[in-house]
Design a protein with these regions (language model features):
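Membrane-proximal intrinsically disordered regions of secretory-pathway and membrane-system proteins
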Residues: 21-25, 233
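Extracellular structured ligand-interaction cores
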Residues: 27, 46, 59, 108-110, ...
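Activation targets extended, charge/polar-rich intrinsically disordered C-terminal tails
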Residues: 127-317, 328-341
Length: 341
């Protein structure tokens, strides 16, 4: 046991010697990148870690938000909630150029870390980017690019790290809604597919799944009682913030659908005729959505359990949609319609 303790201290000491020559010229920063409306996966922003060493010129970006469309079974893994993300390291100037070209704001928080904590953070990140350690199982709110950074800082700094507490009471869904004003179809997909788990009020630390909330939390964080975690903040704000809304919004489409249903219902009542093809489409659509929700609930790791949307998107509608256009028993169909309504 004594030998292990001596070895551990010796390892830290050697690491310190190897790092001390550049320690005064190096720094770690948390980088927060603004939302990008063109893609749903970028709509909430992004977080990463920058390491800059002035004496050697090394300037790199540790990115926990990398995924590969070419990975085996990508779409099946995505559907099952088992998508692998990974951490990678590449040039920070290249990363900054990329995000600037997308007209996204960039905020840098330089961390006020002492030499031993810098060594721990550096070694942690370098171990993480090794191929055998780089992959992790992504989760929308529990394990993403922002929560990874929160967890790493807490592991490196330990109990000395504390956050200022805010009284805002809010759920995951309401936090997401703040970012989806211009991505209404994405908002609709989240509202339909994710269940009531994301409607519960969450503790303050859980809000850091969003990069902006991580930024806000780190701004007021302390090491011990008096030392600010962030020593300096730099910001790049784009000259113009592109913002647009898709005119073909869910509200417009559902309003038009309501007008069509109203028109068809009026003609059915007035002329005593049936529109089985239209009923077929409605039941086919709601049944297909219900089948997807049932699959997400029963067979995946998504936040989709106990989804009350199954009350209107009923999977059996899929079967009865085809019975509508056959000579199947009208009595049974009418009974199902009454039961469904």
């Amino acid at each position: 046991m004594v030998h292990k303790i001596i070895f551990s201290h010796l390892f830290v000491f050697i690491s310190f010697l190897s790092f001390s020559s550049v320690n005064n010229e190096s720094r770690f920063s948390i980088i927060t990148i603004g939302p990008y409306e063109d893609e749903l996966y970028s709509a909430f922003g992004h977080s990463g870690i920058r390491y800059y060493n002035k004496s050697t010129g090394e300037d790199v970006f540790y990115n926990y938000g990398i995924f590969d469309f070419d990975q085996p079974n990508f779409y099946l893994n995505f559907l099952n909630g088992k998508l692998l993300y990974k951490v990678g390291k590449y040039s920070y100037p290249s990363a900054e150029r990329f995000y600037r070209n997308q007209d996204r704001y960039i905020k840098e928080q330089i961390l006020n870390l002492n030499p031993p904590d810098q060594i721990l953070l550096y070694n942690y990140l370098e171990q993480n980017i090794k191929p055998e350690n780089a992959n992790y199982l992504y989760n929308y709110v529990y394990d993403n690019c922002a929560t990874k950074i929160r967890d790493i800082l807490e592991e490196v700094i330990g109990d000395k790290l504390s956050y200022a507490k805010y009284d805002e009471v809010i759920s995951f869904r309401k936090l997401m809604d703040k970012y989806l004003d211009n991505n209404m179809w994405g908002d609709l997909g989240i509202d339909i597919c994710l269940g009531p788990e994301i409607d519960s009020n969450i503790p303050y630390e859980s809000k850091m799944f969003l990069p902006d909330y991580l930024f806000e939390s780190l701004q007021s964080a302390k090491i011990g009682d008096t030392v600010d975690l962030v020593s300096e903040t730099n910001e790049y704000i784009p000259s113009q913030n592109k913002s647009y809304k898709n005119i073909f919004s869910p509200n417009l489409i559902f309003f038009l659908l309501f007008i069509v249903v109203l028109f068809i219902s009026f003609r059915q009542i007035k002329y005593d005729i049936s529109f089985h093809k239209f009923d077929f489409l409605i039941f086919l659509l709601t049944g297909s959505v219900g089948l997807l929700l049932s699959y997400l609930w029963l067979f995946t790791d998504h936040l989709s359990t106990s989804n009350f949307n199954l009350f209107w998107a009923f999977p059996l509608n899929l079967i009865f949609s085809f019975l509508l256009i056959t000579n199947f028993s009208r009595r049974l169909l009418n009974f199902y319609f009454i039961l469904y309504s």
